[in-house]
Amino acid sequence: SFLSCREQDGAQLLSRITQKEVKCVLDPTLLLSAKEWGKYCEFEIPKEPYILVYFLGEKSEHRRAVEKIQKLTNWKIISLPAAYLEMENNDYKKVWGGPKEFLSLIRGAALICTDSFHGTMFSINFQRNFFSFCKSSDSEESSENSRLYSALNIFGLSNRIIHNMDNLTAEDISIDYKNVIPILEEQRRD
């Protein structure tokens, strides 16, 4: 029998419990290419650059981080309201929708700010600039952060997790995907 897990910590735990090798594998959302997911992107998106905000949690410091990024870029903010955080300025738009809107907005965003694991994975798949935020503290028993850390470490993108906004500059926004894509393709083959 074959055992696999989406995160390194989980794979190690299962391996200790079962005394079997447990392989760390890609999240299923990454098994399809951006082109394949693109078939579902039928929602019309804005022409000008925008920051897509998709937060499942309700941390006010995340809101403040997005506002700082918005000031650095002057890009409009579009929010997919899961647990919507009201922005202090009026330079945003809420968008309600389903999977097509979600995928279209991620694919078209200049930058994604999210605390969603899958928001992060789709950002990588569509080769978008993104910042990931942790929904909970690493010390919380219900923390899901290890899954995010594990995935970002595989792609060499652990620097995309925002812990401290103090030194963030506009140059920190861009991601060079030239080293990420070969890793993603190799992981798909595995």
Model-found features: residue ranges?
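Active-site anion-handling motifs in enzyme catalytic cores
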Residues: S1-D190
